[in-house]
Amino acid sequence: MRLKSKIREKKQKPKPTSTDLKIMEWRYNQFLGEKMTYKEIKKDPTNQTFLVTDIKFALDSSHIIVGDKGGRIIIFKNTQYKGENNLEYYFEYLAQDKDFDVHKSIEYTEEIKALDIFPNYNYSNIDILSASYRTIKLDRVYEDKTNIFEDMNKNNLSIPKLNSVKSEIKVKNKKTLTCEKFYEINSLNLNKFVTNNFLSSDDFRVYLWDINSKNSAVYNPIDIEVESNSLFNLEKITKSKYSNFNPHIFFYGTNKGVIKLCDLRSNSEQIKLETNFKDEKSNIKNSIGNQLSSVHDICTSFSNQNFVASRHYFNINLWDIRKQNEPVSKYLIFEPAINKLTYLYHNNYLNDKFSIDCDSSGKYILTGGYNNMFHVFDIEQRLNTQIVIDEKNDQLMNTNIIRKINSKGSCYYKKDDDDLNLINFDQKITKHAFCPNSNFLVIVVYNCIYTYHGNLGKKVG
């Protein structure tokens, strides 16, 4: 007589179908700043100094820093309120000053071109990197505590008693870095693994720096000035960033639409460019085509080592570093505006630069657009969530316009052509930040910031 086995086969869990998947819904949460309209900014030039030029989360998401055209840096604390992120004003200071080049007789403004913040391992200190046109500064914001005692030995000898502790937030400059060969600085990025190292880039060079080094840049691995010194090959570096998955790898993009992966381990003295990412199917080669293909920004994921995303004027390209000849996916940003290309060119709107951010998993990508609209792309479900920021209409600010993206990367409807003339190209979102460890967005509109929380809502289908 055979005994029946008591071991039962494990039932495999069914794979989630499209109807089981849920959509991330983004809800407006907080507003910070003093509202200004585009007309007020255009009318009074002094208002332009308050325009935000860069924004960055700390790696541990404890703080967020904001830089503006006036050289100021504003620090916000990221606190928890009812289980959600909430920003609180902490401190602000003047980080950059005007600079004058004696040899070229050129005055450079104090505008913050790029910034970054060190992880806050010492909770009493906040170390911040900021760059103007030609100067990089390392500042430390700290809390200075002073003990205040009662009047000692006023009448008779006694042990002094502590009355109170006076706390004051101060800032001091720890280091100022300059380089004679500097062109206009366009990038500043910390190494996520070796936090005393960072990189910067200008039009023709990428510099690697060490905070602890007494000298200037450790070395200059990328120099394309000689290659670009031609009337027919005016290639310039537009953005550079360390990867979020390897301390030895960084990327830089150019105005020709090329993204290059650089591995610091390939050569101890001179970098070897191992990978070129360029969309070979792009057949636009005129000056307007270069502006459209120019790399505005680059982002990488902490978890997916093969994932690289780049923002261009009309689209986002998703790259797999194992496939170099073309992007694996392309997402179009407001496709109908291509029909107004001549208008955009003659009004200099093609010079607008848009940022790109992604969450730690690389599942969601955040970018801005015109008409005060920002987009959150769901990579897995191929969805484009569009939200318009309108301070006069709270209901509109909480309205998630969700569109399915087709195989060509488009979520275009014919009715969009009717709305094209209603788009205000002066109202644009170019700067934003994605919290490193939660579904929390910070969106910049002129001199104000708006925050959004993401929660899984209704199912797809």
Please report, for each region that a protein language model flagged, where it lies by residue.
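Inter-blade linker and blade-boundary elements of WD-repeat/beta-propeller domains
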Residues: 6-47, 81-111, 138-187, 207-241, ...
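Loop/turn segments within WD40 beta-propeller blades
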Residues: 55-61, 116-125, 188-195, 234, ...
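Blade-level signature of beta-propeller repeat domains, shared across WD40, Kelch, NHL, RCC1
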Residues: 430-461
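Beta-strand-rich domains and repeat architectures in extracellular enzymes and scaffolds
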Residues: 41-73, 111-114, 119, 186-188
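WD40-repeat beta-propellers
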Residues: 73-78, 136-142, 150, 206-212, ...
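Short loop/turn segments immediately following the C-termini of beta-strands
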Residues: 68-69, 78, 133, 203, ...
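Loop/turn-rich, solvent-exposed surfaces of beta-rich toroidal or solenoidal domains
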Residues: 301-318, 322, 345-400
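Conserved beta-strand element within WD40/beta-propeller blades
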Residues: 64-67, 127-132, 197-201, 250-253, ...
